[in-house]
Amino acid sequence: MKVYFAGFTLLCLCTAVTITGCKPSNDNQSTGVSQDGNSTTPPSAEQTKSVKISGAGASFIYPLISQWSADYNAATGNKINYQSIGSGGGIAQIKAATIDFGSSDKPLDSSELTQAGLGQFPSAIGGVVPVVNLDNIEPGKLRLTGPLLADIFLGKISKWNDAAIISANPGLHLPDTKINIVHRSDGSGTTFNFSNYLSKVSAEWKQKVGEGTSVQWPGGVGGKGNEGVASYVQQIKGSIGYVELAYALQNKMSYTALQNAAGQWVQPSAESFAAAASNADWSNAKDFNLVITNATGEAAWPITATNFILMRKQTKDAAQRKATLDFFKWSFENGQKQANELHYVPLPPNLVKQIEAYWASEFK
């Protein structure tokens, strides 16, 4: 089965992209940054030597990284090779210094960063959404509370017409069908944010399963990457899984509404992700170590997540590290439209300034 997003067609097992000559999504957008930080038209590939940048990690951010990479290549001639292997793989590869940047939806704490000689900074904000394969259930129509979602993944609720689900969905016809669980099989920041949220809303989940990039699932089938989970949910009737919103929308999957910490039923969207992120205190988060699941706010999506970029503080190739940072600087300044189109939340200007100050102090 194929998985579609962002104008790319991928087989579920295809997890890497090398951008070499794709056209930008908007021919009129600003496409470069001058030495004083202002956006300008960049030199052509013929005027400057092409640079190859390698990255690996979270599938959560893959649709956006892919689009940014295509546009950056068209603007500068530089090539980005990003492998969608899961946050755990990205962390392992950047620690081993086999790539220029790693990507994780789970922030590392300062002690782990120091031990590994790494720095980290946010790249974008998105949301994890439960997705289901149920006939005649349109996207956003099925409602689940956090405790209900935990009980489903714990295996305590095993039928779609369970009284607890029906109680949250008056008037919605739910079948007498077994619930089939789909989860990640690889080390995953998406899993971290999903399990972190469930640990906040269910004491039983916290005690029995807990949180992490990999957990001991009570049952179900595992898929590799957001791509793999999306594929399995599409194939298995009565299934439920969790993916980043872009995967659900581009594959026309049915996602659920969730009840947030304020008791409101909310739909996943860039707006509800932004509402969840609006009170995030990044200035007091050392090394940007902040998780924003189960945020307060009437309109907040409860499983909102941040993607983080990991880079080595010490390097033998300062020019390569600068080229990598230039890619993210360009993306922050020129990639907001792409982020919005793919239902991510671009970073606010004040946070970008904090990140650039962090670069100056940590990546010397």
UniProtKB/Swiss-Prot annotation:
GO terms for cellular component: ATP-binding cassette (ABC) transporter complex; periplasmic space. Keywords: Periplasm, Phosphate transport, Signal, Transport. The keyword Transport applies. Residues 25-47 are annotated as: Disordered. Phosphate binds at A58, S59, F60, S87, D105, S188, G189, T190. Pfam families: PBP_like_2 (PF12849). Residues 1-18 form the signal peptide. One of its GO terms (molecular function) is phosphate ion binding. Transmembrane segments: none annotated. Its main location: periplasm. InterPro entries: ABC_phos-bd_PstS, PBP_domain, Phosphate-bind_PstS. One of its GO terms (biological process) is phosphate ion transmembrane transport. It is found in: Periplasm. The keyword Transport applies. The complex is composed of two ATP-binding proteins (PstB), two transmembrane proteins (PstC and PstA) and a solute-binding protein (PstS). Part of the ABC transporter complex PstSACB involved in phosphate import. Belongs to the PstS family. This is Phosphate-binding protein PstS. It comes from Xylella fastidiosa (strain 9a5c).
